[in-house]
């Protein structure tokens, strides 16, 4: 039999996640467990001296525990086994002797430190929430004694205060911490698993948006707005493409195909040092294609004259390596005389587009939802939508939206007219004739 090949540091470092958790053996029972999410855990398989049943030892998370350190822990465990001593019992006793080692806060901070892939901003925010809402209540508690009700108490307090989103995130964090405790043999089972359904159902946030009957008024105010050229272009592109704020603010020039009039927004972007959330790509974590209308291409060509020599479409005022403020579009809307809390905000452009596209009766729901990059809850339908993309229909649809806005510059064009006319004509011929009839 060929001797088992041992791991080397390079293999450990470059091990990539797969669809399912898998193991990489090092010998002597030691192996690296690589989760589907990319986390790497050192474990050792052995048989308990008392009953000869197979068990597992947890040695920690890579890279906090290196390959050499994991081997040293394995060797120590083997010495104990030779003496008929269960290394897991010794491991637990050693942890108990370490003052505070079993407190919820100690384990939570260990879990926090193990998440090496997080951005600094995200790491700080996660820890700040735990320090603010969780540690004051259960931080000093022995994690082995915590029950579901203990874990829920501080989270329910946050939920009752109306901070439902914060409470949901805290529930996720506490569940992950307790899962980490199970995986590292601090506890045998996860009481946080039973917290599901205990919090208020979070209602979808609705952003203020203008009805289509007010499009002429809005477009007139936009035409009269005399802010910075880059700001005006940002507002117009936001309206024409109805993408999310971060998707536009962090856009790079290399995402645009000018020959095909397409914008490919990546699932994730390279982070800009010192810029919060600059790593954000698509909310749904997959590439999104935005067909660009003629009007959008004109704006992009204008913008290229201003920032085309930079990486970003919308660099900061004083530092080209930074990006324009997240409040830029809403500030412009306020300067135009709108209340961004009750009348219209930048995110409300998505609602305005969704309403007009749907009311027109010209476009399939699949094409509209795909263009809005909404998640599809039905898995079978989602697979179909993802495969087909509906790109040809979406090209027509995005041009229709831009043309419809243009047509509303001087007077309101009712969507009821479109609904009453479309049944006689197909999309292409109908739209051409309709545009000619209202000139």
UniProtKB/Swiss-Prot annotation:
PROSITE patterns: CB (PS51900), TYR_RECOMBINASE (PS51898)
Catalytic residues of the enzyme: 244, 273, 347, 350, 374, 384
Entry keywords, A to Z: DNA integration, DNA recombination, DNA-binding, Hydrolase, Transferase, Viral genome integration, Virus entry into host cell
Record-annotated Core-binding (CB) domain positions: 102-182
Gene3D superfamilies: 1.10.150.130, Integrase, DNA-binding domain, Intergrase catalytic core
Pfam families: Arm-DNA-bind_3, Phage_int_M, Phage_integrase
GO terms, biological process: DNA integration; DNA recombination; DNA-templated viral transcription; establishment of integrated proviral latency; symbiont entry into host cell; viral genome integration into host DNA
Ion transport among keywords: no
CDD domains registered for this protein in UniProt: INT_P4_C
Example GO molecular function: transferase activity
Residues covered by the Tyr recombinase domain: 205-398
EC number(s) on file: 2.7.7.-, 3.1.-.-
Family to which this protein belongs: Belongs to the 'phage' integrase family.
Function: Integrase is necessary for integration of the phage into the host genome by site-specific recombination.
Matches recorded under PANTHER family: PROPHAGE INTEGRASE (PTHR30629), PROTEIN INTB-RELATED (PTHR30629:SF9)
Name used for this protein in its record: Integrase
Gene name for this UniProt entry: int
């Amino acid at each position: 039999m060929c001797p088992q090949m041992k791991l080397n540091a390079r293999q450990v470092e470059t091990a990539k996640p797969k669809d399912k958790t898998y193991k990489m053996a090092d010998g002597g029972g030691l192996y690296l467990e690589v989760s589907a999410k990319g986390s790497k855990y050192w474990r050792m398989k052995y048989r308990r001296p008392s009953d000869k049943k197979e068990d597992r030892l947890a040695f920690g998370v890579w890279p906090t525990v290196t390959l050499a350190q994991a081997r040293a822990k394995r060797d120590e465990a083997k010495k104990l086994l030779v003496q008929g001593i269960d290394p897991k019992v010794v491991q637990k006793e050693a942890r108990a002797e370490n003052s505070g080692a079993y407190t919820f806060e100690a384990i939570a901070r260990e879990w926090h430190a193990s998440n090496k892939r997080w951005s600094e901003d995200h790491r700080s925010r996660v820890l700040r929430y735990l320090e603010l809402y969780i540690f004051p209540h259960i931080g000093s508690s022995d994690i082995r004694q915590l029950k579901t009700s203990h874990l829920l108490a501080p989270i329910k307090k946050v939920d009752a205060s109306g901070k439902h989103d914060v409470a949901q995130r805290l529930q996720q964090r506490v569940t992950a911490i307790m899962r980490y405790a199970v995986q590292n043999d601090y506890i045998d089972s996860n009481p946080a698993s039973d917290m599901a359904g205990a919090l208020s159902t979070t209602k979808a946030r609705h952003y203020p948006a203008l009805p289509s009957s007010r499009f002429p008024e809005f477009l007139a105010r936009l035409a009269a707005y005399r802010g910075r050229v880059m700001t005006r272009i940002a507002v117009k592109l936001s309206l024409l493409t109805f993408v999310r704020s971060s998707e536009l603010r962090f856009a790079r020039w290399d995402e645009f195909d000018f020959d095909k009039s397409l914008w490919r927004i990546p699932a994730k972007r390279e982070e800009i040092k010192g810029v919060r959330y600059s790593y954000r790509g698509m909310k749904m974590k997959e590439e999104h294609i935005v067909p660009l209308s003629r009007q959008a291409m004109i704006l992009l060509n204008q913008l290229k004259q201003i920032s085309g020599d930079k990486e970003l479409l919308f660099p900061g005022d004083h530092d080209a390596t930074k990006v324009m403020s997240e409040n830029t579009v809403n500030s412009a809307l306020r300067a135009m005389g709108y209340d961004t809390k009750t009348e219209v905000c930048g995110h409300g452009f998505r609602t305005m587009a969704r309403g007009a596209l749907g009311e027109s009766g010209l476009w399939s729901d699949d094409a509209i939802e795909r263009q809005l990059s909404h998640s599809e809850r039905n898995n079978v339908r989602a697979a179909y939508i993802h495969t087909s993309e509906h790109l040809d229909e979406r090209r027509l649809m995005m041009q229709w939206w831009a043309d419809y806005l243009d047509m509303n510059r001087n007077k309101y064009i009712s969507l009821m007219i479109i609904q009453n006319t479309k049944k006689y004509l197909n999309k292409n011929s109908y739209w051409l004739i309709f545009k000619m009839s209202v000139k």
